[in-house]
Amino acid sequence: MSSNFTLAVCSEMVFLDLPHIERVKKIHSLGFAVEIWDWTQKDIAALAATGAKFTSMTGYITGRLGDQEGAAELLRTAEQSIPIAHALGNPSLNLHGTGLDNKGLPAQPCFLCPMLQRFRK
């Protein structure tokens, strides 16, 4: 049975007894795409050389979506993630931030949308 879906496995959560690069190779050998988290701690050239299909990665280094200052930082570091995503052939950056303001309450969507629209440009 074939599927139109790409199934991906988070390399941060499986085969934890293996070094990260070996996890990626194993996931790829099993026919799955790969997701990664903090790219700043990874050998990007080695990951790209595995031939694995990367479908998602954390798309920022620091920042948060719950306030102006944090969102500006998130967007600034998201820009640094773009060339890494290109190097991996990865089409998706996950900008989850915290989704909360500094009081621990859900942030207002009307605040978040303009922030994310700036990044899309």
Stretch-by-stretch model annotation:
Residues D67-K121:
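Active-site acidic/histidine proton-transfer and metal-coordination neighborhood
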Residues M1-P91:
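N-terminal pre-domain/capping segments
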